[in-house]
């Protein structure tokens, strides 16, 4: 068993409370959004905090959480520490726990993402085997799902594909399974590149997927460029992504909040893309367009 101690603080106090919990014997401390404030693009090298941050400390069973609460109240002032709560956590076999929540998922008419230990009965299905790991991307997030559905509906036979910000490699691997002749998977995170290589091998498309950091990307033109990252990087990368799409080729963008869609679409329209109507889901957006100039 474990114990979890949680408290809500203003953002300027979050780091200090985190340090105090660690000093009090916490095994780990994490931050959660205590309100409803999206925070998707913290500066590199910083820990994301919110205007109202929920600080969560994990302790071994038997710790005196009441004494810790009292000590923090005396140090920071009870009025600055709000909504205290405690919770007992049972030991879990985490592999079994995620399997209870991560089931085969279908995207479009034929593409499935299936974790280890499950099968898909549909004989016409295109099945990707993928388990949760270190890198982002299992298909559960709306932005990933929107991109997978686009791929399922596209004609990818013989296509050259760029997966920029590949994470787990899910989009590039899906493209290869759906018929793409070659995929360039790019990410700034070495763990993401390693995950992509392993997942591509597991799905027997490793010979069609090349991984690289942005600086090591080979010179090529793609028929389709996919970028499921965030709005600000997408706008900053517009020239770089355009240069990787052949005239007449297509671009697919996601990781964009609904209120950011017009700004991102305008940037790419100015770069010579004919943008299609946005597709919305749960506050997120997928944009797609064709390079005309």
UniProtKB/Swiss-Prot annotation:
Keyword Methyltransferase: yes
One GO term of the biological process aspect: methylation
Keyword Methyltransferase: yes
Record Pfam families: PrmA
GO molecular function annotations of the record: protein-lysine N-methyltransferase activity
UniProt: S-adenosyl-L-methionine binding residues: 144, 165, 187, 228
Subcellular location: Cytoplasm
GO cellular component: cytosol
Documented EC number(s): 2.1.1.-
Transmembrane feature ranges: none
SUPFAM superfamilies the UniProt entry points to: S-adenosyl-L-methionine-dependent methyltransferases
CDD domains the UniProt entry points to: AdoMet_MTases (cd02440)
UniProt keyword list: Cytoplasm, Methyltransferase, S-adenosyl-L-methionine, Transferase
Gene3D superfamilies the record matches: Vaccinia Virus protein VP39
Catalysed reaction equations from the record: L-lysyl-[protein] + 3 S-adenosyl-L-methionine = N(6),N(6),N(6)-trimethyl-L-lysyl-[protein] + 3 S-adenosyl-L-homocysteine + 3 H(+)
Family stated for the protein in its record: Belongs to the methyltransferase superfamily. PrmA family.
Function: Methylates ribosomal protein L11.
Protein name as annotated: Ribosomal protein L11 methyltransferase
Species, as recorded: Methylococcus capsulatus (strain ATCC 33009 / NCIMB 11132 / Bath)
Name of the coding gene: prmA
């Amino acid at each position: 068993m474990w114990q979890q101690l949680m408290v809500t603080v203003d953002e300027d106090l979050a780091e200090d409370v985190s340090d105090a919990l660690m000093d009090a014997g916490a095994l780990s401390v994490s931050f959660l959004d205590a309100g409803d404030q999206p925070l998707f693009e913290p500066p590199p090298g910083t820990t994301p905090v919110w205007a109202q941050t929920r600080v969560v400390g994990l302790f071994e069973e038997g710790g005196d959480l009441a004494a810790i609460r009292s000590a923090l109240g005396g140090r920071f002032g009870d009025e600055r520490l709000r909504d205290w709560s405690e919770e007992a956590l049972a030991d879990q076999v985490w592999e079994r726990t995620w399997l209870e929540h991560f089931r085969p998922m279908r995207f479009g008419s034929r593409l499935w993402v299936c974790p280890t230990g499950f099968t898909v009965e549909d004989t016409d299905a295109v099945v990707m085997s993928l388990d949760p790991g270190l890198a982002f991307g299992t298909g559960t997030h709306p932005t990933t799902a929107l991109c997978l559905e686009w791929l399922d509906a596209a004609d990818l036979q013989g296509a050259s594909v760029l997966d920029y910000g590949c994470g787990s490699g899910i989009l590039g691997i899906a493209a290869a399974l759906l018929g793409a002749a070659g995929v360039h998977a790019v990410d700034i995170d070495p763990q993401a590149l390693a995950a992509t290589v392993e997942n591509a091998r597991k799905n027997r498309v490793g010979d069609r997927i090349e991984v690289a950091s942005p600086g090591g990307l080979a010179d090529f033109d793609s028929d389709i460029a996919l970028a499921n990252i965030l709005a600000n990087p997408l706008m900053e990368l517009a020239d770089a992504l355009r240069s990787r799409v052949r005239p007449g080729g297509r671009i697919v963008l996601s990781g964009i909040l609904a209120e950011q869609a017009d700004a991102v679409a305008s940037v790419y329209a100015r770069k010579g893309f004919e943008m299609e109507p946005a597709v919305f889901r749960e506050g997120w957006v997928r944009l797609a367009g064709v390079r005309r100039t």
